[in-house]
From Swiss-Prot:
This is Transcriptional repressor NrdR. Disulfide bonds: none annotated. The keyword Transcription applies. Negatively regulates transcription of bacterial ribonucleotide reductase nrd genes and operons by binding to NrdR-boxes. It comes from the Bacteria. Pfam families: ATP-cone (PF03477), Zn_ribbon_NrdR (PF22811). NCBIfam families: transcriptional regulator NrdR (TIGR00244). Its cofactor is Zn(2+). PANTHER family: TRANSCRIPTIONAL REPRESSOR NRDR. One of its GO terms (biological process) is negative regulation of DNA-templated transcription. One of its GO terms (molecular function) is zinc ion binding. Belongs to the NrdR family.
Length: 154
């Protein structure tokens, strides 16, 4: 690895540790030319499947769009950023685990609803109302009644 201070090619690893729940390797390095120390982080580059929209068009997976949609549903709800990020990691893991190059956007929507239901039922109802295009109060009631009948998902 090139030294960010002097540009030399020769660096040695002093220390390596797993971070981010084993998803990253943190390495402390030292330049053999100038002696400066610096930290690098390694993550596996995993390709997310492309999404097939309901109209048949295809687009790349957009983590920021997913995060924004979940944040909108969780707005003013008592859910930490850490729990949201963990839910995002879980959704991405499930999508990669399909082994498919393309997945229907409906699959992503269902995964989001499952994770939101675990995080906060109000956020789940908010998201479901938009995602499933609730037309009237009866549809809200039916979904709330269904939630009330289910055992808590944690």
């Amino acid at each position: 690895m090139h030294c960010p201070f002097c540009g030399a090619n020769d660096t040695k690893v002093i220390d390596s540790r797993l971070v981010a729940e084993g998803e990253q390797v943190r390495r402390r390095r030292e330049c053999l030319a100038c002696g400066e120390r610096f930290t690098t982080f390694e993550t596996a580059e995993l390709v997310m499947p492309r999404l097939i929209k309901t109209d048949g068009s295809r687009q790349p997976f957009d983590e920021e769009k997913l995060r924004a949609g979940m944040q909108r549903a969780l707005e003013k709800r008592p859910v930490s950023v850490e729990r949201l990020e963990a839910a995002l990691v879980h959704i991405k893991h499930k999508l990669r685990a399909t082994g498919e190059r393309e997945v229907k956007s409906l699959v992503v929507g269902e995964l989001v609803m499952t994770e939101l239901q675990k995080l906060d039922e109000v956020a789940y109802i908010r998201f479901a109302s938009v995602y499933r295009r609730f037309q009237d109060l009866n549809e809200f009631r039916e979904e709330i009644d269904r939630l009330a009948r289910e055992p808590a998902k944690q």
